[in-house]
Amino acid sequence: MTWTTPDLCDRFPEVAVAEPLFRHFGGRTTFSGPIATVRCVEDNSRIRELASTPGDGRVLVVDGQGSLRHALFGDQIGAQAVANGWAGVLIHGCVRDVEILAGLPLGVLALAACPRRTERRDLGDVDVPVNFAGVAFVPGHWLYADANGVVVAAAPLSLEVVGMEH
């Protein structure tokens, strides 16, 4: 049996549940992993840098301040993330190239799509706690996402103990 976020909430009441703000854009709707973070506003320089490093099954959480004016993530960075082993991304902002993202074996959650590319000014913070959707996303904590929503735990959940696979 595989996990679902409702099952995780039932079995682990201490998990944080993100407000239901996000849409799935990637080829995977179920994904999980340790969190890495970027805080940026309309500049995806740090996202591009991180996507080109080994993901090791991590989930990149991006606090784009909820901006709907520019896309922070698209097909090129998505392809880099897949090639480097990232499990998924959660973006408090926009994506673009949605037809291509839908074909990638990557979890991609974002607020919306926007065709305008980002500005690149080499700005942003990496591996800092970020807060949005009613949740604190801390580097090293774990994110679990599926079609039901997003939950965050301070440590990996013992899924095998409750008969679930990771």
Swiss-Prot record:
- Entry's Gene Ontology molecular function annotations: 4-hydroxy-4-methyl-2-oxoglutarate aldolase activity; metal ion binding; oxaloacetate decarboxylase activity; ribonuclease inhibitor activity
Biological processes per GO annotation: regulation of RNA metabolic process
Family statement drawn from the similarity comment of this UniProt entry? Belongs to the class II aldolase/RraA-like family.
Pfam families associated with the record: RraA-like
Coiled-coil region(s): none
Write down the required cofactor(s): a divalent metal cation
Listed under subunit, the entry gives: Homotrimer.
The name under which this protein is listed is Putative 4-hydroxy-4-methyl-2-oxoglutarate aldolase
Catalyzed reactions per annotation: 4-hydroxy-4-methyl-2-oxoglutarate = 2 pyruvate; oxaloacetate + H(+) = pyruvate + CO2
Q: Which residues bind a divalent metal cation?
A: D97
> Which organism is the protein's source?
Xanthomonas campestris pv. campestris (strain B100)
The entry's function note states: Catalyzes the aldol cleavage of 4-hydroxy-4-methyl-2-oxoglutarate (HMG) into 2 molecules of pyruvate. Also contains a secondary oxaloacetate (OAA) decarboxylase activity due to the common pyruvate enolate transition state formed following C-C bond cleavage in the retro-aldol and decarboxylation reactions.
